[in-house]
C-alpha cells in the first residue's frame, strides 16, 4: 500500500500549467510571421532579454532588435508563407529535466520566394522558452544556407 502511494506521488499530472497557453502564443507568433500582417505584434511577444539562435551557419545568439530584423528579412524574401506543425511538444528545464512550459515544434514551412517566384517547402525544428509570458529564448533549426541556395535563379532564367 505504501509503495502505491509513493509511486503515485512521483507521477506528474501532465504538462506544465503554462504549456497550453504558450502553445497558443507560439501559434499566434507563427501565423503573424506567415501573414506579415503586424511585425510589431510579433515583437511585442518578445522579452527584452531575448536570446535567439538564427538558422544561419556560424551565427551566434541575437537579441531583440536583431531578431526583429531577422523576422522582417524572412518576410521580405518570402510570400504566402504557412507553417504546418507536425506537433507541439513540451520542453524541459535543461538543468532539472522538469517540464517548464517551453514549447518545441517540428513542422513544415511552405511559401513562394519573392524574387524568383519559386514555390518551396522546408522541414524545420523550433524552440521557444518563456519568461513573464513572453518569448525569451529559442531558435530556428534548419539548413538556411542550403534552403536559400535552392531558391537562387537558375542559369536558364
What are these regions (language model features)?
Residues 1-2:
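Sec-dependent signal peptide recognition
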Residues 10-157:
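C-terminal and inter-domain tail/linker signature
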Amino acid at each position: 500500500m505504501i509503495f502505491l502511494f509513493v509511486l503515485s506521488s512521483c507521477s506528474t499530472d501532465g504538462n506544465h500549467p503554462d504549456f497550453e497557453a504558450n502553445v497558443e502564443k507560439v501559434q499566434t507568433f507563427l501565423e503573424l510571421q506567415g501573414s506579415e500582417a503586424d511585425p510589431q505584434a510579433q515583437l511585442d511577444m518578445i522579452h527584452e532579454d531575448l536570446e535567439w539562435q538564427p538558422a544561419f551557419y556560424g551565427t551566434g545568439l541575437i537579441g531583440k532588435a536583431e531578431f526583429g530584423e531577422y523576422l522582417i528579412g524572412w518576410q521580405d524574401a518570402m510570400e504566402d508563407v504557412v507553417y504546418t506543425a507536425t506537433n507541439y511538444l513540451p520542453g524541459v528545464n535543461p538543468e532539472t529535466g522538469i517540464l517548464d512550459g517551453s514549447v518545441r515544434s517540428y513542422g513544415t514551412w511552405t511559401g513562394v520566394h519573392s524574387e524568383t517566384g519559386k514555390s518551396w517547402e522546408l522541414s524545420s525544428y523550433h524552440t521557444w522558452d518563456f519568461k513573464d509570458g513572453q518569448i525569451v529564448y529559442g531558435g530556428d533549426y534548419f539548413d538556411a544556407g542550403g534552403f536559400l541556395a535552392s531558391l537562387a535563379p537558375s542559369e536558364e532564367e
